[in-house]
Structures are given as structure tokens and as C-alpha cells.
Amino acid sequence: MPRKPGITTKAREKAKPAQAVAKPAPEVAKLGYFVGKWATQGTILPGPWGSGGDFSWTETTEWMSGNFFVVGHWDFKMPAELGGDGEELFVMGYDTNRNVYSFDAFSSQGLHQVSKGTLSGDLWTWTSESIQNGKPVQQKMTMEILSPLSYNLKFELSTDGATWMTFMEGKAVKKQ
């Protein structure tokens, strides 16, 4: 004969220890700097990638439920020789096992970028690797926080890990 739920079953359920709710690591809170609406403008320098030109993007970034990750969306404008205009979805987080920040981005141009980041004082440094013309290229994005409402950025490329070429430089300004 099956047991009917009753006081005994309910008492057992209440006696179960409550599951600990996971809390974000303290480092995760630092990603909150990027939450909001941003406008970024800058210049792509001439180089092996082409003649360069102006770039811009608008960005909306928010906390994902649980406050472990920041999710964002960019609408960008680039010179046509570099792929032109598009959009990108990205997720930022912190890997407590590796003690490193993470950045995963997916663009409307079919690109997927995976970066690792560090924060030292007011300087964020993001590194990644891509394949260009069949060869590995190291990438480095530095973001120097100027104030709660702005930061400078610089994106560099290297084929040997020692010599870096500046691809683009710009400034981001928070709108909200």
C-alpha cells in the first residue's frame, strides 16, 4: 500500500538543510563598472589590415540574473575593408578556479572571440588569439579607467608575442 504524504513527510522536508545559495566572488562585482549604456569612438590605424579609419559602437550592458555574469550588446561601425557595420553579443564573468576574468563574444560577422582578462589598479587587460591569413595572431585590449564614466581603450596585435602593433585606439563614455 503506497504511503500517503502526511506530517511525517512534511517534517522530514522541513528538517532538510537549506541549500547554500551560491554568491558571486568579490572580483565579479568589479565587472559592474561596465553595466549601463556606453558610446565609444576612436581610430583604426593604418597597417597590414588596411588603411584604417574611424570606428564607433554603442553598447548596452546589464547583469544577468544572479549577478555572476554581465551580458552586453554592441552595435558597431567599422571601415568597409574591415567588415563594415555589425553587432556583437558578449558575456563577461570571472573564473574563480583560474582567477581570471572571461569575455566571450559572438558577432554578426560570424566571429567568436574568447578572451581572458586581468585587472591591475585602473587597468583592464584582455588577451586572446585569432587566426588571420592562416597564422595565429595574439590580441591585447587594454582599458584604462579614467573615471566612473569613461575609459580609454587600445587594441594591439602581435604575430610573435613580442612586437605589438596598435590596431585601434579610442575612448568610451558612459551615457547611463
Language-model features: locations:
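Hydrophobic small-molecule pocket/channel-lining residues, especially in calycin-type beta-barrels
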Residues: 2-176
